[in-house]
C-alpha cells in the first residue's frame, strides 16, 4: 500500500504498496466518533515516509474524471544487433474492465464527482490506468516522473499511483495508476479499488482497523462504512479544496458527526 512522496507546486503525489506504521493496537469493532476523526486525519494529512512533509491543505478533484485504460505486454525486438524488450499496447482484459467499472461507479456515487468522455470533449484523459507486466512497472513511458521514483514505486510489484496537484489550491490535475497485470485477479481487483480510491485525495494507509481499504492487511474489493465516511467527508461540499489542516479538521468533525449518524 501507499508510500507518499511530495514535491512543491508542480506537486507530484506518489504512492505504492506499503503500510503506514500503527499508532496503537488495531481496533476490532467500529470506531468511535473521535477515532473516526483521527482516522480521517491520518489518511489525508499524515505522511508515511520519514523526512517527507505531509500535505498541508485539502487536495481533491474539482474537475470531471476522464478515465482511460491501457494494457501492455512485452515484445522482443531487435535493434542495432541487440534484442530489446519493449511494451506493446494490447486489448484490455474483460475482468479488468469489469473491476474498474464497478469501482468507478461506487466512487462516483460516494463523491458525486462527474465523468467525461475525452473523445467527446477533445480533452486528454486525466485519470489513466495502466496494466503492465511486473518488470515493466517502472518503465518511464508510463508517466512523466523521475525514473528513480518510478523504479522505487514499482519495486513492491503490486500497484502504485501518482497524482499531480497544485500545492497551494489543492486541486488535483491528473492521476496515473500502474497495475501489475501478472497478479491474481482477486489481487488486481483489490488493488484497483485501493489505488482508485487513494488517487482521489486519500493517499495514506492505516492499520488502525483491518476492515478498511486503507489497511495493509485488507484484501477488500468493496468500500466499508468507515471507508465511505472518510471518502464522503473529503468530498462533502463543506470540505473546501485548499483548506489548511486545522480548518479542515474542524469541518471534518461536523461532517463525520452527520455521516456517522446517517449511515447504516
Feature roles, as predicted:
Residues 1-8:
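Bacterial N-terminal signal peptides that target proteins for export
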Residues 3, 118-121, 221-222:
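A general structural signal for short secondary-structure junctions and capping/turn motifs
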Residues 8-16:
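Bacterial N-terminal signal peptides
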Residues 17-27:
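Boundary at the C-terminal end of the N-terminal hydrophobic targeting segment
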Residues 25-81:
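Non-catalytic architectural context of zinc metalloproteases
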Residues 27-43, 49-52, 145-187, 203-264:
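Metalloprotease/metallohydrolase-associated module, dominated by Zn2+-dependent proteases
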Residues 69-79, 83-95, 176-187, 213-222:
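Second-shell loop/turn segments in exported
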Residues 90-193, 198-199, 203-209:
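Metzincin-family zinc-dependent endopeptidase catalytic domain
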Amino acid at each position: 500500500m501507499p508510500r507518499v512522496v511530495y514535491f512543491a507546486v508542480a506537486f507530484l503525489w506518489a504512492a505504492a504498496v506499503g503500510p503506514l506504521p500503527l499508532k496503537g493496537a488495531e481496533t476490532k469493532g467500529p470506531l468511535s466518533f473521535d477515532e473516526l476523526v483521527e482516522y480521517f486525519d491520518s489518511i489525508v494529512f499524515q505522511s508515511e515516509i520519514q523526512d517527507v512533509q505531509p500535505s498541508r491543505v485539502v487536495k481533491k478533484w474539482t474537475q470531471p474524471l476522464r478515465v482511460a485504460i491501457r494494457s501492455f505486454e512485452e515484445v522482443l525486438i531487435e535493434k542495432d544487433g541487440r534484442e530489446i524488450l519493449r511494451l506493446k499496447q494490447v486489448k484490455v482484459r474483460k475482468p479488468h474492465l469489469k473491476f474498474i467499472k464497478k469501482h468507478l461507479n461506487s466512487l462516483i456515487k460516494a463523491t458525486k464527482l462527474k465523468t467525461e468522455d475525452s473523445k467527446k470533449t477533445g480533452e486528454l484523459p486525466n485519470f489513466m490506468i495502466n496494466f503492465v507486466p511486473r518488470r515493466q512497472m517502472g518503465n518511464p513511458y508510463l508517466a512523466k516522473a523521475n525514473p528513480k521514483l518510478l523504479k522505487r514505486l514499482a519495486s513492491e510489484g503490486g500497484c502504485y499511483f501518482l497524482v499531480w496537484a497544485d500545492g497551494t489550491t489543492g486541486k488535483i490535475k491528473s492521476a496515473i495508476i500502474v497495475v501489475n497485470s501478472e497478479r491474481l485477479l482477486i489481487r488486481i481487483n483489490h488493488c484497483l479499488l485501493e489505488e482508485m480510491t487513494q488517487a482521489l485525495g486519500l493517499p495514506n494507509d492505516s492499520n488502525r482497523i483491518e476492515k478498511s481499504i486503507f489497511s495493509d492487511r485488507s484484501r477488500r474489493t468493496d468500500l466499508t462504512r468507515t471507508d465511505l465516511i472518510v471518502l464522503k467527508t473529503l468530498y462533502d461540499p463543506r470540505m473546501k479544496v485548499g483548506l489548511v489542516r486545522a480548518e479542515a479538521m474542524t469541518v471534518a468533525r461536523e461532517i463525520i458527526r452527520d455521516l456517522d449518524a446517517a449511515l447504516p
